[in-house]
């Protein structure tokens, strides 16, 4: 059960980082 919780936290952290980078780089992509 603990493994499932740690996996969920890991995926959640990766998604947060991904969206943070994606939204941060979006203005530059749109300017191109």
From Swiss-Prot:
What are the record keywords, sorted?
A: Chloroplast, Membrane, Photosynthesis, Photosystem II, Plastid, Thylakoid, Transmembrane, Transmembrane helix
Q: Does the keyword Isomerase apply?
A: no
Location (main, coarse): plastid
Has UniProt tagged this entry with the keyword Membrane? yes
A Gene Ontology biological process term? photosynthesis
Q: Can you list the GO cellular component terms from the UniProt entry?
A: chloroplast thylakoid membrane; photosystem II reaction center
* InterPro entries, per the entry: PSII_PsbT, PSII_PsbT_sf
User: Transmembrane residues, as ranges?
Assistant: 3-23
How is the protein disposed in the membrane? Answer: Single-pass membrane protein
Signal peptide positions on this chain: none
Give the subcellular location.
Plastid, Chloroplast thylakoid membrane
Note the subunit structure: PSII is composed of 1 copy each of membrane proteins PsbA, PsbB, PsbC, PsbD, PsbE, PsbF, PsbH, PsbI, PsbJ, PsbK, PsbL, PsbM, PsbT, PsbX, PsbY, PsbZ, Psb30/Ycf12, at least 3 peripheral proteins of the oxygen-evolving complex and a large number of cofactors. It forms dimeric complexes.
> What family is reported?
Belongs to the PsbT family.
The UniProt function text for this chain reads: Found at the monomer-monomer interface of the photosystem II (PS II) dimer, plays a role in assembly and dimerization of PSII. PSII is a light-driven water plastoquinone oxidoreductase, using light energy to abstract electrons from H(2)O, generating a proton gradient subsequently used for ATP formation.
The name of this protein is Photosystem II reaction center protein T
Organism the protein comes from:
Thalassiosira pseudonana
């Amino acid at each position: 059960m603990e493994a499932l919780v740690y996996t969920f936290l890991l995926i959640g952290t990766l998604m947060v980082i991904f969206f943070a980078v994606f939204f941060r780089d979006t203005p530059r992509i749109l300017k191109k």
